Amino acid sequence: MASKILFIGGTGYIGKFIVEASAKAGHPTFVLVRESTLSNPAKSVVIYNFKNLGVNFLIGDLFDHESLVKAIKQVDVVISTVGHAQLVEQDRIIAAIKEAGNVKRFFPSEFGNDVDRVNAVEPAKSAFATKANVRRAIEAEGIPYTYVSSNFFSGYFLLSFNQPGATAPPRDKVVILGDGNPKAVFNKEDDIATYTIKAVDDPRTLNKILYIKPPANTISFNDLVSLWEKKIGKTLERIYVPEEQLLKNIQEASVPVNVVLSIGHSVFVKGDHTNFEIEPSFGVEASELYPDVKYTTVDEYLKQFV
């Protein structure tokens, strides 16, 4: 029997992909929503899609303990996809899971770098630390978990090539942080969702980090630019920003540019997606666990922009 799954933050950016994957995989799927979300015009398309997929809405709020406990008691698994501002509030979910006493597994809001293995500067450093603190709280309470480290969303990073404010890949020049040699990992949101849902009832992912690092999506920035150049039949001007200059730029920038740049520093300069080995004691890799999943490669993903 497929586990019943409750989503908290299910109408958000990555949440909506995972909710859809859950429903399509045959899991009884529940989304915690506020009354106001159901009538919010900005969310109407997402809500409509969820209804068509047979998703159940449970009225409640992250800040209403009783509603959280009540919702959690109806399911087996809780997946949090809350946004940046609510990361720190996941203690509320942990407390409710603890009180409900029936949860087989909790997936906190992660879906990025492995926050226990990062070399970051502010403001990324604090964001990563918040997620790491949530991990420690889950472990301290003895709640069964899976942490999904899905690295970069293709829909953001391959669309923009990490150029702040860009809405399409570059056509003439491209700014590269550091020397462009460390490898990063780019995954399509639908694939992240598919792998996450496959992990829900898999004993191999219990109390582990699920890394989504498919070989064809692990590529250096220099190679990414070369791949793109081949596709558009044009050589781009490459502007390299040395680490020292980048650190200065981060300090001088304001939100959200400083966030984008500091995450870029962690990934593209320090190599935080790929500078460690996945040990069986703490992690497993999704494309190895689920070779049947036909994931979208970076090469395939870029074709749509040519």
UniProtKB/Swiss-Prot annotation:
Example of a GO biological process term: lignan biosynthetic process
A GO molecular-function descriptor: oxidoreductase activity, acting on NAD(P)H, oxygen as acceptor
Binding site for NADP(+): G9, G10, T11, G12, Y13, I14, G15, R34, K43, R135
Protein name from the UniProt record: Phenylcoumaran benzylic ether reductase POP1
Catalytic function, reaction form: (-)-dehydrodiconiferyl alcohol + NADPH + H(+) = (S)-isodihydrodehydrodiconiferyl alcohol + NADP(+); (+)-dehydrodiconiferyl alcohol + NADPH + H(+) = (R)-isodihydrodehydrodiconiferyl alcohol + NADP(+); (2R,3S)-dihydrodehydrodiconiferyl alcohol + NADPH + H(+) = (S)-tetrahydrodehydrodiconiferyl alcohol + NADP(+); (2S,3R)-dihydrodehydrodiconiferyl alcohol + NADPH + H(+) = (R)-tetrahydrodehydrodiconiferyl alcohol + NADP(+)
Active site residues of this protein: K131 (proton acceptor)
Native organism: Populus trichocarpa (Western balsam poplar)
Statement: the UniProt record of this protein carries the keyword Zinc-finger: no
Keywords: NADP, Oxidoreductase
Encoding gene per record: PCBER
InterPro entries registered for this protein in UniProt: NAD(P)-bd_dom_sf, NmrA-like, NmrA-type/Isoflavone_red_sf, PCBER-like
